[in-house]
């Protein structure tokens, strides 16, 4: 992405915004004084927008089904209890410095039959308004960069305990919307991706609990094309991700219930590779000397597969990329909800660490959820003290045990 030098100050603001979300889709592995930074395009695709998940450190691949299951694990939609549902999720961003950057997400689903469920989602991330000026202060116009994704979900319940699901999406990233011709234009980037997921839920009999179950889920998301912003530029990988988790749910008595979840995430994107010549000069590995780093020449699928074993530090480096989420939820009469979680990202995956808290209220068909993020490291982050709000509804018959 190249801009006129005259607008460098404004571009630095945009760069800061992009880097703040890029931190969600990058990791840093240090070796021999080098930083092996993994970056992707459209990192907003990994942001969990719903307040229920956010209140539990963004667990979601194995929690009970809800309106936002399409993001976390589309296979869960087949296990949702009501016939129809929809929700809106709102997440303000960088509130410490501006009030016009936010991520909004809308979800909806409908049961086609007791075993088949379809859904749709829309995600819109606005990067605010940027006023471009030249070196003399002359007005060059206003840009309102944004990113957008339109998604469809489908889930099929194979048996009482097992379901599978898939999602498909169109992604648009417009980082120069409205910029004047005095700035080198950045064409909109587009990409297509799919998710494949599975969800297993088994009832258990444990101690004095009235009811209990164990859920296990897996979702490989954003498998798809690279995204490119110019004809001459190199396309970027989108944030392909693998999530694997388990959730235990327990009903203590007719009024009290709880859940506890553990989830692991790994970004399935190649790690940059470096070489050092006889003079000690360090550069990206470029075996065919075409000025394009070898890892960038990998296709999406090849890059995804090699990401399991391409770290310079071997298996230790691969394990250092894994993000851990721990979350819990307590419910009273399935009406009042209290949530908490712990998010741990190793230095090799970005270094974010925070605790979360959340509240929920369900009244008739409506549900309102709120979450709050509190960092626990000295390093300041644009995510500090972030909140998310969700409102949704579910209607129709209870299809909890209606299958086949």
PLM feature spans:
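Subset of outer-membrane beta-barrel
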Residues: 26-404
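Bacterial Sec-dependent N-terminal signal peptides
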Residues: 1-28, 246, 266, 328
């Amino acid at each position: 992405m190249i801009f006129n030098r005259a607008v460098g100050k404004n571009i630095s603001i945009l760069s800061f915004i992009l880097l703040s979300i890029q931190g969600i889709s990058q990791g840093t592995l240090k070796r021999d004084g080098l930083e092996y930074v993994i970056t992707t395009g459209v990192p907003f695709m990994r942001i969990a927008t719903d307040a229920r998940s956010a209140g539990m450190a963004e667990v979601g691949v194995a929690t009970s089904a809800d309106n936002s299951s399409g993001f976390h694990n589309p296979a869960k939609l087949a296990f949702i209890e009501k016939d129809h549902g929809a929700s809106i999720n709102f997440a303000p961003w960088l509130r410490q410095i501006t009030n016009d950057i936010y991520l909004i997400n809308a979800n909806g689903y409908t049961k086609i039959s007791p075993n088949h469920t379809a859904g749709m989602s829309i995600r819109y991330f606005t990067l605010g308004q940027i006023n471009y000026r030249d070196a003399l202060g002359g007005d060059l116009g206003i840009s309102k960069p944004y990113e957008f994704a339109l998604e469809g979900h489908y889930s099929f319940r194979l048996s009482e305990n097992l379901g599978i699901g898939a999602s498909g999406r169109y992604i648009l990233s417009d980082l120069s919307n409205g910029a004047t011709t005095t700035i080198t234009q950045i064409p909109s980037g587009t990409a297509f991706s799919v998710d494949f997921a599975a969800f297993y839920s088994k009832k258990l009999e444990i101690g004095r609990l009235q009811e209990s179950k164990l859920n296990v889920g897996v979702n490989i998301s954003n498998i798809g094309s690279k995204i490119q912003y110019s004809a001459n530029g190199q396309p970027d990988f989108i944030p392909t991700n693998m999530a694997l988790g388990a959730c235990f749910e327990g009903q203590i008595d007719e009024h009290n219930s709880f859940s506890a979840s553990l989830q692991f995430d790994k970004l399935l994107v190649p790690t940059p590779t470096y070489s050092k010549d006889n003079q000690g000069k360090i550069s990206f590995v470029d075996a065919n000397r075409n000025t394009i780093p070898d890892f960038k020449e990998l296709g999406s699928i090849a890059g995804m597969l090699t990401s399991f074993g391409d770290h310079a530090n071997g298996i230790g480096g691969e394990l250092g990329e894994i993000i851990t989420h721990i979350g819990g939820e307590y419910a009273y009469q399935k009406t009042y909800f209290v949530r908490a979680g712990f998010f741990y990202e190793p230095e090799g995956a970005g270094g974010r660490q925070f605790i979360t808290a959340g509240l929920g209220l369900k009244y008739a068909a409506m549900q309102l959820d709120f979450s709050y993020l509190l960092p626990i490291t000295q390093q300041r982050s644009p995510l500090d003290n972030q909140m998310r709000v969700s409102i949704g509804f579910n209607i129709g018959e209870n299809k909890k045990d209606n299958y086949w």
